């Protein structure tokens, strides 16, 4: 298996390279009857797109989706949905000098040893360009989850370098290019990124994703845990080096009396577990966080090796993001939505008729 497919019942297979003629995906397992047209993909794809601010790559792609199959008269048919986006703004000449060199911190060296051949143009298959189709598939998952269960999946940038939000307001996230939840800090972020870009360096970031209204019961024990699937899905995103569910690694310094999420008739008293216990959703918000490393595509020279083992000096030209975390928010949202839809369908297949006499308590109360 080449691992280009994701999911068990709701499956997504992506294809294409950064500088190839097109990228695409095939979505299988989407239930029939979901209203869907090409225009619905535009919003999230533009949120992910490059060239929208001076703080991201200058590459400009239209990212217009062509629906090739699986939709008839505006409704999904239950058959595979094939989506295609044509690449129109490749500049492969920017990579002419590194075809035989290994860029430090990139997948060049590992791809070379695995396949014995690699596409150096923009990173080929290892480029974040591939995530465009994940966002497209996420649009389908988000819509189905919202219509079927009222589930919403939202994300925001929770750290940029050493800067963290001084406040939080969901309404601020959509109004700035950083997906930052505190509008008053945006000028600080602008100044920080301007200085970083001038220096030729890059920086890491963190993104948080929150899924609200997830019903209790989604996820499977042991090898199909909801948090396990979320971790695997989020770790598959380019540059992600760590995943937390709920309080994550902060749990190491908490006492049990603090970390346990007490149940009351009014709701859970806290959500340290991130809405998942035993690998199964509790009805609380599902909360996941990712950390993204600083990109290694730098204008600053660094020593490396070529394919013959000779020492070379590598300078990465081309158009790159000084912080890949800025555009990662819609990608992380898409992966969370895809996991939730897959788990929802899996739950319905085995336990759709299960009912309990225990009343469903609210996700959390402010007590």
Swiss-Prot record:
PROSITE patterns registered for this protein in UniProt: CHORISMATE_SYNTHASE_1, CHORISMATE_SYNTHASE_2, CHORISMATE_SYNTHASE_3
Record EC number: 4.2.3.5
Cell membrane recorded as keyword: no
SUPFAM superfamilies: Chorismate synthase, AroC
Positions bound to NADP(+): 48, 54
GO biological process, any: aromatic amino acid family biosynthetic process
Keywords assigned: Amino-acid biosynthesis, Aromatic amino acid biosynthesis, FAD, Flavoprotein, FMN, Lyase, NADP
InterPro entries: Chorismate_synth (IPR000453), Chorismate_synth_AroC_sf (IPR035904), Chorismate_synthase_CS (IPR020541)
Cofactor note: Reduced FMN (FMNH(2)).
Binding site for FMN: 125-127, 238-239, 278, 293-297, 319
Pfam families membership: Chorismate_synt
Pathway: Metabolic intermediate biosynthesis; chorismate biosynthesis; chorismate from D-erythrose 4-phosphate and phosphoenolpyruvate: step 7/7
Record carries keyword NADP: yes
Disulfide bond residue pairs: none
A Gene Ontology term for the protein's cellular component: cytosol
Catalytic activity: 5-O-(1-carboxyvinyl)-3-phosphoshikimate = chorismate + phosphate
Cofactor: FMNH2
Physiological role: This reaction introduces a second double bond into the aromatic ring system.
HAMAP family: Chorismate_synth
Annotated protein name in UniProt: Chorismate synthase
Native source organism of the sequence: Stenotrophomonas maltophilia (strain R551-3)
Gene name of the record: aroC
């Amino acid at each position: 298996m080449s691992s280009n497919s994701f999911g068990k019942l709701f499956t997504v297979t992506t294809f294409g390279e950064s500088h190839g003629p097109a990228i695409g995906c095939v979505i299988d397992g989407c239930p029939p009857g979901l209203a869907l047209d090409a225009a619905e993909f535009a919003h999230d794809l533009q949120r992910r797109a490059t060239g929208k601010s001076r703080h991201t790559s200058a590459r400009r792609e239209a990212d217009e989706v062509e629906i090739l199959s699986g939709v008839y008269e505006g409704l999904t048919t239950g058959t595979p949905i094939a989506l295609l986006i044509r690449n129109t703004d490749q500049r492969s000449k920017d990579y002419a000098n590194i075809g035989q060199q290994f860029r430090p911190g990139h997948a060049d060296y590992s791809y070379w040893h695995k396949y014995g051949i690699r596409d150096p143009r923009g990173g080929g298959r290892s480029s974040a360009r591939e995530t465009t189709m994940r966002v497209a598939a996420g649009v389908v998952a988000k819509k189905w989850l919202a219509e079927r269960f009222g589930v919403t999946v939202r994300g925001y940038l929770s750290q940029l370098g050493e800067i963290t939000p001084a406040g939080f307001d969901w309404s601020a996230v959509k109004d700035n290019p950083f997906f930052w939840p505190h509008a008053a800090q945006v000028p600080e972020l602008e100044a920080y990124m301007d200085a970083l870009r001038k220096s030729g360096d890059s920086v890491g970031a963190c993104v948080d994703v929150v899924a609200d209204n997830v019903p209790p019961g989604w996820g499977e024990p042991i090898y199909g845990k909801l948090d396990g699937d979320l971790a695997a899905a989020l770790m598959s995103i380019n540059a992600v080096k760590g995943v937390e569910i709920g309080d994550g690694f902060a749990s190491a310094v908490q006492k049990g009396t603090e970390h346990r999420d007490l149940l009351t008739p009014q709701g859970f008293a806290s959500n340290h577990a991130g809405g998942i216990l035993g690998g199964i959703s509790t009805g609380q918000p599902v909360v996941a966080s990712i950390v993204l490393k600083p990109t290694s595509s730098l204008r600053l020279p660094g020593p490396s090796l070529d394919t013959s083992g000779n020492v070379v000096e590598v300078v990465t030209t081309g158009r790159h993001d000084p912080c890949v975390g800025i555009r990662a928010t819609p990608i992380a949202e898409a992966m969370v939505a895809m996991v939730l839809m897959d788990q929802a369908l899996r739950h319905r297949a085995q336990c759709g008729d299960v009912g309990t006499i225990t009343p469903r308590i609210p996700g959390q109360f402010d007590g």
